[in-house]
Design a protein with these regions (language model features):
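Short beta-strand-to-loop junctions in surface cap/lid or active-site-entrance loops
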Residues: 1-7
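Active-site metal-coordination/substrate-binding segment of hydrolases
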Residues: 8-73, 342-345
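Acidic, glycine-rich active-site loops and adjacent beta-strand->loop/helix elements
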Residues: 17-19, 41, 75-84, 106-111, ...
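An extended, acidic, His-containing surface patch that forms the Zn2+-binding/catalytic region
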Residues: 20, 112-113, 169-228, 232-236, ...
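Acidic/histidine-rich catalytic neighborhood of metal-dependent amide-processing enzymes
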Residues: 46-121
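A generic structural motif
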Residues: 48, 136, 243-250, 280
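A short core secondary-structure module
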Residues: 89, 145-167
Length: 350
């Protein structure tokens, strides 16, 4: 941090240096940990999420170090991608050292290439594991098929209960957030998916569904691979489920609603349990506060383009820790990456 001047406001600059695993190496067109510039873009794991945030803060401080208009504190984390498990305890211990008037989290991004963007909301998150344990041993499908519901049948029915034929989430008791958002067009979201052929649900508003409403995804299923498949009825199966929450939804309430839905939709008297795991609140950042307005003005002058305000369908788990610990600080969510070609967490991140 810089030497403190009591006459100046204090800005805390946050980013994280840790990254996601590489994933399928065969889908990368460059070496993931060897930075490479192709057509003006930097490719490599962490190039956007979030080493770009670290470099952004470094360059800002370097450019202004001779005449800093504010006090600067820099906080670079190394556990964000595993949910920042030590963040709350760390903030408790170092609250006085990290106190600031403005907290700039450079872990978001831009809606389009060339459009400077401020993030005004983040969805919350709860997740957990559905566990099916039928009281039986594995039996040849020729001996038991059609007589008892095996674990895969049970799990499939529960998973199918989460959405209706229109793709609408069927978990009761969750309330969408109500706020004005930038309206995404169908072509925008197809660019993010990298396909013009992907079919979207019929929606009144893509942006509201993506940023302000709950959304459930099945992240993984424990099952034998098709290469190892044999004619057996399986007694045990698991599925990891992730429920994105509206920015203003209470995560404890949402976890309860998720579990209740699962328990109410157990078919055929099967033995099913739910193991809650991660839980985090969403965030709403007011774009009309002083620092954000100054930032947007400078964005537009430098980029020679109107700034955009967007929500983010994902979560930044630690952000709520900052909000709770520093309730009077202005929270600003920005980033160097973009939604069009960024590929955060995926192959060919740039």
């Amino acid at each position: 941090q810089t030497e403190h001047d009591p006459k100046k406001k204090t800005v805390l600059l946050y980013a994280h240096h840790d990254v996601q695993p590489v994933g399928d190496i065969d889908k990368w067109k460059t070496e993931p940990f060897t930075p490479q510039i192709i057509d003006g873009r930097l490719y490599g794991r962490g190039s956007g999420d979030n080493k770009a945030g670290v470099v952004t803060h470094y360059e800002v401080v370097k450019a202004l170090k001779e005449d800093l208009p504010v006090n600067i504190k820099v906080f670079i984390e190394g556990e964000e991608e595993i949910g920042s498990p030590c963040m709350a305890e760390f903030l408790d211990e170092y609250q006085d050292d990290l106190e600031a008037d403005v907290i700039v989290i450079a872990d978001s991004g831009n809606i389009k290439i060339g459009t400077p963007t401020v993030t005004t909301s983040l969805r919350g998150l709860v997740d957990g594991v559905i566990v099916v344990e039928q009281p039986m041993r594995a039996v040849h499908s020729g001996l038991g098929g059609g007589v008892v519901p095996d674990a895969f049948m049970v799990l499939s029915k529960i998973i199918a209960s989460f959405h209706n034929e229109k793709g609408e989430l069927q978990i009761e008791g969750l309330t969408p957030s109500d706020m004005e958002v930038l309206e995404l067009e169908e072509k925008d979201i197809k660019e993010i998916f990298g396909s013009k052929d992907i079919n979207l649900f019929e929606l009144d508003s893509i942006s509201k569904r993506l940023w302000l409403e709950p959304a459930l995804s099945i992240l993984a299923i424990d099952a034998p691979s098709t290469d190892e498949a044999v004619n057996l009825l399986i007694p045990n199966a698991k599925a990891k489920v992730s429920l994105r929450l509206p920015p203003t939804e209470n995560p404890e309430h949402a976890m309860k609603m998720l579990e209740e839905h699962i328990m109410k939709n157990i078919p055929w008297g099967a033995k099913v349990s739910f193991e809650p795991e991660a839980m985090g609140s969403g965030i709403v950042a007011d774009p009309n506060k002083e620092f954000t307005k100054i930032l947007v003005k400078n964005f537009e002058e430098v980029w020679e383009n109107n700034a955009a305000y967007m929500g983010v369908g994902g979560s930044i788990p630690f952000a709520n820790d900052f909000v709770e610990k520093f309730p009077n600080a202005e929270l600003v969510l920005v980033g160097a990456a973009d939604e069009e070609m960024g590929n955060a967490h995926a192959p060919n991140e740039s």
